[in-house]
Structures are given as structure tokens and as C-alpha cells.
């Protein structure tokens, strides 16, 4: 087969990718395992820009397989919450962090970013790894995040994709997943519309951790309530 390696070629690959929007069933289970592994370097890089205090209360939106919840449990002595709208993601995150849940240090909740099941002014930090692509309305959903943040609280966004003109694979992913990819300037604009300030971004270009031929732009954005 002589097709470009950067194109999405097989139906199996397409089915797996489509499942990334909301993991379900056996494919979703497999995908979450792959995400836990493939996003690790990105997450480490992103978190290196985040100052976490021992008493910070943290919410991870779109917690997926739960590895970032597990990470934060080692960085704060306070409770860590994970939220996802995928049933299987909630199940996997719960299994991974069961000991902390039993100790009362962790909660994994099924829910949507558009209607967070938390009181106003609850969290010091809300994190979003590889998930804002799928938020129904980024500005309004960011306002909902701001609602549950304490005064001076932080929203942290970590993405491995930025808009890349002429990238055929990215275009296919956008079409397949109905996803939205934002630049640092767009994040700045939309987060300000949502009421955030002190917005800073960090970018890093490098090979994708799974495909050495695919170069992506890593982007971390931090803003304050």
C-alpha cells in the first residue's frame, strides 16, 4: 500500500480514534490504556510548569484512565477529584486509584464539564489534559470551571496539538472526532472572555511519543481566576 504514512488508513484505526471522543466498550478500554502510556511525556512536561502546594484541592476534568489523578495524589496531601463523561473512563480511573479512594483521598465522578457537580469556589486547581478539544462550548464551559475555582485558583490546560496548516492527518482527526484545536492566542482570547486573567502559555515542538515521523506542537496554558 503506497498511501502516505501520515494518513489514517484502516477502518480499525478509524474506529479506535473515533472512540477517543468518548471511550466505550472494549475499544475504549484499549484506547485508555494507550492514552495512559502515550500521553505520559506530555503530561510530565505540562505539569513541570504547574506549582502545586501540599494543601491544594485538585480536580482533573476528562480524567480518562486516571494516571494524572494518581500523579496529583503524590503531589498534594489534599483530596484529588477526577471527572469524566465516559463510563469506562470512570471505571478505569476508579480501579487505578482504588486505594486512595478507600482512604478518602480521592473521588472519581461521572459528569460533564458543562455542568460540574461541585459547589462554587471549591478547588485550587482544575486540570484539563487532552480534553478541551471536545468541550461543547469552550468559553461557557470555561466559565463553569471558573465557578468551581476558588479566588486566585488556576485552570491548567495541556494539549499535544495546535492548529497546523496543511497537516492532512490533523485534518482527518478533526473531521473524525469533530474536535476543535486552539492556538495559544485563541486560548488567551477565550479564557479572557470567560473571566480569567494572568494567562500564560508554554509551547514545545517535538516528535510524537508514538510516531517518530509525526511532529506536533505541545501547548500548556495556565490562567487564574
Residue ranges of each PLM-predicted region?
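Class I SAM-dependent methyltransferase SAM/SAH-binding core
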Residues: 59-115
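Conserved beta-strand signature within the Rossmann-like core of class I S-adenosyl-L-methionine
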Residues: 153-159
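A short glycine-rich, Lys/Arg-flanked "PGG" loop and its adjoining helix->strand segment in the class I
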Residues: 139-151
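Short alpha-helix
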Residues: 179-195
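A short SAM/SAH-binding and catalytic strip from SAM-dependent methyltransferases
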Residues: 125-138
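Conserved SAM-binding loop and adjacent beta-strand
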Residues: 27-47
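A short acidic, Gly/Pro-enriched loop at the edge of an enzyme's catalytic core
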Residues: 114-125
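Short, glycine-/aromatic-enriched active-site segment of Class I SAM-dependent methyltransferases
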Residues: 161-178
Amino acid at each position: 500500500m503506497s498511501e502516505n504514512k501520515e494518513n489514517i488508513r484502516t477502518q480499525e484505526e478509524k474506529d479506535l480514534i473515533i472512540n477517543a471522543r468518548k471511550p466505550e466498550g472494549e475499544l475504549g478500554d484499549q484506547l485508555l490504556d494507550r492514552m495512559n502510556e502515550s500521553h505520559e511525556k506530555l503530561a510530565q512536561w505540562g505539569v513541570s510548569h504547574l506549582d502545586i502546594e501540599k494543601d491544594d484541592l485538585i480536580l482533573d476534568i476528562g480524567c480518562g484512565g486516571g494516571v494524572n489523578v494518581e500523579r496529583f495524589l503524590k503531589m498534594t496531601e489534599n483530596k484529588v477529584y477526577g471527572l469524566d463523561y465516559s463510563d469506562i473512563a470512570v471505571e478505569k480511573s476508579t480501579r487505578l486509584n482504588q486505594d486512595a479512594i478507600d482512604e478518602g483521598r480521592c473521588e472519581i465522578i461521572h459528569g460533564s464539564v458543562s455542568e460540574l457537580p461541585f459547589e462554587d469556589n471549591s478547588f485550587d486547581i482544575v486540570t484539563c489534559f487532552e480534553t478541551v478539544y471536545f468541550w461543547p462550548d469552550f468559553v461557557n464551559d470555561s466559565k463553569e470551571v471558573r465557578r468551581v475555582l476558588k479566588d486566585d485558583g488556576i485552570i491548567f490546560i495541556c494539549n499535544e496539538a495546535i492548529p497546523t496548516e496543511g497537516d492532512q492527518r490533523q485534518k482527518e482527526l478533526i473531521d473524525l472526532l469533530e474536535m476543535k484545536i486552539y492556538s495559544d492566542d485563541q486560548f488567551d482570547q477565550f479564557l479572557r472572555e470567560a473571566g480569567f486573567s494572568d494567562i500564560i502559555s508554554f509551547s514545545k515542538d517535538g516528535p510524537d511519543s508514538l510516531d517518530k515521523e509525526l511532529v506536533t506542537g505541545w501547548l500548556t496554558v495556565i490562567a487564574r481566576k
